[in-house]
Amino acid sequence: MLDRRIALRSLAQPRFAVLRYPAGQPPHGSANESPGANVEAIDLLIDARWVIPVNPAGRVLEHHSVAVRDGRILAVQPAAAAHAAYHAAERVELPRHALIPGLVNLHTHASMALMRGLADDMALMQWLQDRIWPAEARHVSPQFVYDGTLLACAEMLRGGITCFNEMYFYPGDAARAALDMGMRAALGLIAIDLPTAYASDAEDYLAKGLDLRDTLREQPLLSFCMAPHAPYTVSDRTFSRLLTLAEELDLPVHMHVHETQDEIARSVAQHGMRPLERLRRLGLVGPNLIAVHAIHLNKEEIALLVQNGCSVAHCPSSNLKFANGFAPVTRMLADGVNVGLGTDGSASNNRLDLFQEMRLAALLAKGLSGDARALPAQRALSMATLDGARALRLDHAIGSIESGKLADLAAVEFNVPDMLPCYDPISHLVYTAGRENVSHVWVAGRLLVENRELKNRPKNDLENLIVLWQNRLSMETKA
């Protein structure tokens, strides 16, 4: 391991190189040279200026290579040692890049990408009741969800996001889009005590969700969460049924919690207690809970989350845009709550950009605490990767660059004027880099973004879909 405070040297090297070899031809020496007896055949070798594994925290490996076989990381080694040890079918040279784990978006509503900018500068409940719910009633369909999720996946992949935790209607169509794009998704099996075009009542939501899980449970890119929308839209009876299913199936429970002061006031008026206390009494506060937003928490509620091993999905941009308040992230982290980062949906953010969320989370923590050391860059990066994976209970497979884990990876280019000079790559990733600096993305070892271009879906297809939906939804902007 080398010191993180490294200055960029000459910029004369190429931005990247991809070396592909015909079957049976070794990637070293002449075409007639055979690999040595101790050389191991692999699918992919990625050489990077810096490999940032995230675990251990703060480590930066200079001039290292990541060896990949069958979609998994086989080894992380100094480049010279890796070149001697492995016979790679493909080698990618990234001499001016940092290789990081693929980012994990811990909370989003992917297909709402089609509603980006539809209704801005409004408080949450006005936004929902006056604009979003009516628009959803008129437009949301399986095709809406499929097309919107395609658009969201394209945006997320180009920004280094390789896994997203989804909560929306028609999750099967979201799954289809994610699989078509080659992206990893945790599908929320949504439950709400309101009829929609997707389901007539809570039992219908749950039945459809369970059928979907049974159908897709063997898909390696998919996992599942129970996804009750929020305490103010789900009844005690539905929560009890959902808890039983979550325990039987061992699934996380992904839900909006304590997002606004109004939500809390209405819960006290209706139930005689704050939402988190109600959830505790119903048995839902436990290690499976992913509490989204979690803005208005007192000390006792933070302690409750800690004691029960809960996770929080922190969505700073969405929280600010709705003027909902400031989540006590510094206190949660200090006390031991696992906190990941989410974008929320495009209709409320309006970007699916975890680089933005990392930077904003770190800056807000410093400004609100009055402590410049609060939420350092390495912790922000962990929140966007390993901590999000941990909340989804996928940290055994993704979230860090370690032998045995899936090769969900993103490369960030530093060889551009706005990224120079660089003394500390991790600091640069959080305070300087943007998603526009992401050059390559792999999911399970499969290259999905190369030199900033999507490999899997023609750009003009997405543009045509966007135009069609924009024409249909344009009437909503006049509401």
Regions found by a protein language model. Give the residues of each.
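Active-site microenvironment of metallo-dependent hydrolases
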Residues: 2-64, 68-74, 79, 85, ...
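His/Asp/Glu-enriched, well-ordered alpha-helical/loop segment
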Residues: 281-288, 330-416, 432-433
